[in-house]
């Protein structure tokens, strides 16, 4: 939003979102916290709320009649809204920024995305080639995680730390994954008594939640970027955190817990279109960091890989070289700025004032 406003100072905004969007001048019709239902069971329990959110969005679109609709992630909701907008506001431009990960699974969605949008603005450098295979267009605009790391480095000192060497543990952002992952991650790290252990706390999860697993000598921190940037190595729950860890230059092993690991293997082979799981590896197209998933997420396997990360300097340097290649592939251009320029440039001949939903 701020990037669009920088390009078009007369732009006005309305939508579904949170405090940050409201502070940037957006008229909020529904707070995103009333929409965050994770998993099939949660959606079933909240079907009436889900439908109410659709109704709110539909009525707001008809009331606002914006020039542009910008969709961000959340495909099950946004694709339905896009279909409604196409039917009722056919002149409106629709852009998908941070599109669904169709390159990983639910590949069939790519046809619906192409049919319902005027442009797809991807955040991974391999996405344009993937869309091209199906005869569609996707523009890579840059990566928001790269932008965040760059801004953090500009404001932070990375001249090293006077603290003793330590292992960073990033157990995830949700309580369920923290409770499943943290105990095994701690056990693996404890096998290296020459290194201290520090744990990253997730936003919205109280310190007291971690207390049942953390010894008194293992501190909890909410400054995750600083924790990772100065760590000697890290154990990271798979997700965006693996990419953040790579861009911060910390050797890592990635883990992922599943409740039914054998069933996960069948699901992976049947539905998942990528043979790699973590973002750094997917971006590179090969395994730069070891992925300890499902049956392979054991204390022994994690500790074995951690030993190499801590003690094998040549191995560490190869990983850091791969990290540099990831940064090169992601590029330096800010994703929001590029996306804003494309959006405004494509509609500024239609209206003097941009109304964005």
What are these regions (language model features)?
Residues 1-357:
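Nucleotide-activated sugar donor-binding and catalytic core shared by glycosyltransferases
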């Amino acid at each position: 939003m701020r990037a669009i406003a920088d390009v078009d100072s007369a732009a006005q905004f309305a939508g579904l979102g949170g405090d940050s969007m409201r502070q940037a001048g957006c008229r909020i019709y529904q707070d995103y916290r009333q929409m965050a239902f994770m998993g099939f069971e949660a959606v079933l329990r909240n079907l009436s709320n889900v439908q109410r959110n659709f109704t709110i969005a539909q009525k707001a679109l008809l009331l606002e009649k914006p020039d542009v609709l910008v969709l961000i992630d959340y495909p099950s909701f946004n694709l339905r809204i896009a279909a409604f907008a196409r039917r009722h506001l056919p002149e409106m431009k629709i852009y998908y920024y941070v599109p669904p990960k169709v390159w990983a699974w639910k590949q069939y969605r790519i046809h619906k995305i192409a049919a319902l949008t005027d442009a797809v603005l991807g955040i991974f450098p391999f996405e344009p080639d993937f869309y091209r295979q199906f005869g569609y267009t996707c523009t890579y605009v840059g990566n928001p995680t790269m932008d965040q790391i760059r801004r953090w480095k500009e404001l932070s000192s990375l001249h090293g730390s006077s603290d003793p060497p330590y292992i960073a543990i990033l157990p995830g952002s949700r309580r369920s994954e923290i409770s499943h992952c943290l105990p095994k991650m701690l056990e693996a790290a404890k096998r290296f008594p020459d290194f201290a252990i520090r744990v990253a706390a997730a936003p919205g999860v109280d310190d007291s939640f971690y207390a049942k697993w953390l010894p008194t000598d293992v501190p909890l921190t909410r400054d995750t970027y600083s924790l990772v940037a100065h760590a000697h190595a890290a154990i990271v729950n798979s997700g965006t955190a693996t990419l953040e860890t790579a861009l911060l230059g910390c050797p890592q092993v990635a883990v992922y817990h599943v409740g039914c690991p054998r069933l996960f293997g069948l699901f992976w082979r049947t539905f998942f279109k990528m043979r790699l799981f973590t973002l750094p590896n997917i971006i590179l197209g090969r395994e730069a960091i070891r992925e300890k998933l499902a049956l392979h997420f054991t204390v022994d396997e994690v500790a074995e890989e951690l030993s190499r990360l801590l003690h094998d300097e040549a191995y560490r340097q190869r990983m850091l070289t791969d990290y540099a290649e990831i940064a090169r592939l992601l590029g330096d251009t800010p994703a929001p700025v590029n996306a804003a320029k494309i959006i405004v440039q494509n509609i500024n001949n239609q209206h003097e004032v941009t109304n964005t939903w």
